[in-house]
């Protein structure tokens, strides 16, 4: 079966370098905290100051349901009509969301929240595990799409203004201090159990300052008789690339250690719960050069023996794939890349006991000799592991003529290999591709 999916120009999945090295941002602004905060973190100062005139009338904390379609500014009064009840409708197995908004003219020292029980008229209830909430935190950004091109590439920082925007949902932080003249949203989610009895369930979000109730926000969940399958059963072909290397750096743990896997598990479980289908694996060193903050290492060790033949070790590759499968992502493995952005291939040279690089390109004899050896070995290994049928040799944004030369090498090594490409559409090679992610717009 062939897959044709849409390639969205989004960031690779991983932990963003929210705070750069030595406790400063990449612009050099001190963060006033360790360079890799884990449990919580201090937000950067807002370039936009609150308006004394606008905030003068806010003498006590105000709390209301807002809309999930708005990112509320941290120091600007929210433009909304106060609402103490909101109703969410969903199928069994569906996730429904709401956003509560707190804004205060005076300091709230210990803002926290909790849920009441949610029951219908017949006494049926939704489990506590169905509900979760988190403070929405603010991060620094700039005018990302100011030129309207929506593209990546070099940007002159002076041409783009900085601003603080609501972005991550912090489910680790259970309470926080809210300074005067500040907006603090709370994101609420109900993952309706598939076993829930259809009906209307009523409950509330309790917003407090310490033990003092500030506001009860009533919430109704209307559960349909229809049922959404589990994320692993969704037909939607979701492919968000993962970066295990970024996680290792941020959490300061050795690559591929048990500590590394433990740090990644909650992140990759969230990805699995979103319906992710594909494991991102790497066959070569720096397949995208240094494009990302943490460049990608190879998950396969290449060794050129003293007699000139090739050998390959798949220990890291196996550990990564088995880990991802353990969190529920197990339908496809995309392996990058036979055509890295810089056509330089790293290997361990047994004769000199050192790492070396060979520069070669599709269409050259050295390229074919090296990759036929690798893919022949890789095919054998995948078949032994039982993964061959879900594995694809993947490339990213490569020209058609380069792809045609590369496809010849793949077919020579094993004509049954699936091939994936993320890039522009070329009708000439479309029949040869199993998973084709194309750019739109």
Where do the protein language model's features map onto the residues?
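Aromatic- and acid-rich polysaccharide-binding/catalytic face
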Residues: 417-441
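Mature N-terminal, pre-catalytic/accessory segment of carbohydrate-active enzymes
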Residues: 20-289, 385-388
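Aromatic-lined carbohydrate-binding surfaces of glycoside hydrolases
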Residues: 160-161, 170, 191, 201-209, ...
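Bacterial Sec-dependent N-terminal signal peptides
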Residues: 1-25
